[in-house]
Amino acid sequence: MPMVQVFSIASILIWPIFLVFAVNFYKIHDKNKAEKFLAVYEKIKPKLATLLTLGLICLTYAGLVTIVLNSEMQEFIKLSENNNELVSVINNFVPMIGKLILLLLPLLMATWFSPMLIVYNHYSLFKSIKSSIAGCLMYIAPLGLSWLIFSTTAILFMLSCGVLIGSLASFFPSIGPSLMGAIIFFALLVITSVMFAFQYISYRDIFKSARSY
């Protein structure tokens, strides 16, 4: 468990840096350019401290959300362990997830564009956060619709993968666990890749008039 916690903390801290590397892949292909990894790193290097500070803000906010919902999470875990009625578990799960989404929404809006604005537009930390939130609010209808379509498609895709895993496991019990890991990894890779593409396209279209480097 301690190693998992350390990995989770490190992942949140470096997430803005990783996000810029990932989005840059779509940026260079969109502009038909070729850039080596070191060239991308040199572009990001002057902004590493700012990106890490953004990661620290994300970590702090996520920690506060965890504290706020900790009691409800603990109650849900106990309920799911001791209660075999699926309806009762779902009735407690849905409100908790609703609160989690509402609490994390400001963080999502603050960090949706800010890493790219820091690196490509040379915005300061707080200007990038403010501009990211403003961009999300100004285009909340198309972004919200796109997110709804993306989330629905991702859920259906994961459910389809679950059915595929169950079918393969019943036909090939000996290799079922290995296939399950490979299919889940592939599914998450596809979903994450599509999310990064959506993130780049929304950044490009919303901030197309802002000077970028």
Where in the sequence are the language-model features?
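Hydrophobic alpha-helical membrane segments
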Residues: 1-213
